[in-house]
Amino acid sequence: MPIFFYLFTTLIIISSLCVVLSKNSVYSVLWLIFTFINAAGLMILLGAEFLAMLLIVIYVGAVAVLFLFVIMMLDINFNQAITKLRENLSLSIFITLIMFVDLVITVILSTKNINHSSNISFAIANNISNTKAIGSVLYTDFMLPFQMAGLILFVAMISCITLTLKKRERVKYQDIRKQLSHNKGNVILMTKPILNKGVENIKYE
């Protein structure tokens, strides 16, 4: 078991670095999928098969594949992206250092609050699956954060739909109800044009 733990952990670290360092976005997404698969292996080692299946189905099967399709369909100029990155290299390094220092400080402050002298053991009932245990905790102790997360995702979904349904002034739209209500009385126009004037003064709907 420790061998598999170190194996999955090493593969996660290597694949995560490849996600960031890969110049091709398609390769980055493939490395991201590989990272999620190894994380699912860690979940299986911890006995959380439900979380492992969620990682595979949701992140690999939906999110990562969606990223892959979007990147493959977009016409991305990698040389131009690299040029822009080099122009803002100093700013990128500065922001990276700030985030790294923030992460180190957070880890140091978090480890100080851990009481290493206490030896607490948690009894896990054999008749309760990890799915039932996660559900009972999620809908009792963490019910409010869970509902807020769902509300945030719902607002994000509505915002995406609103942005895609934004009407443009120069785009012509079909009025289906008006088209279906046409008959020969309001479609066929009988007129007698004036000599040498053609149909200039005829008004169409």
UniProtKB/Swiss-Prot annotation:
This chain's function reads:
NDH-1 shuttles electrons from NADH, via FMN and iron-sulfur (Fe-S) centers, to quinones in the respiratory chain. Couples the redox reaction to proton translocation (for every two electrons transferred, four hydrogen ions are translocated across the cytoplasmic membrane), and thus conserves the redox energy in a proton gradient.
**What catalytic activity does the UniProt entry give for this protein?**
a quinone + NADH + 5 H(+)(in) = a quinol + NAD(+) + 4 H(+)(out)
Q: Classify the protein's membrane topology as the record does.
A: Multi-pass membrane protein
**UniProtKB keywords:** Cell membrane, Membrane, NAD, Quinone, Translocase, Transmembrane, Transmembrane helix
Q: What class of enzyme is it?
A: translocase
Task: Output the Gene Ontology cellular-component terms.
Answer: plasma membrane
- Family annotation (NCBIfam families): PRK06638.1-4
Question: What's the chief localization of this chain?
Answer: membrane
Q: Which PANTHER family match?
A: NADH-UBIQUINONE OXIDOREDUCTASE CHAIN 6
Protein's UniProt name: NADH-quinone oxidoreductase subunit J
What's this protein's family per the entry? Belongs to the complex I subunit 6 family.
Residues that span the membrane, as ranges: 1-21, 26-46, 54-74, 89-109, 142-162
**Domain of life (superkingdom):** Bacteria
User: Where is this protein found?
Assistant: Cell membrane
Q: What is its EC number?
A: 7.1.1.-
Q: Which organism is it from?
A: Rickettsia typhi (strain ATCC VR-144 / Wilmington)
Q: Name one GO molecular function term.
A: NADH dehydrogenase (ubiquinone) activity
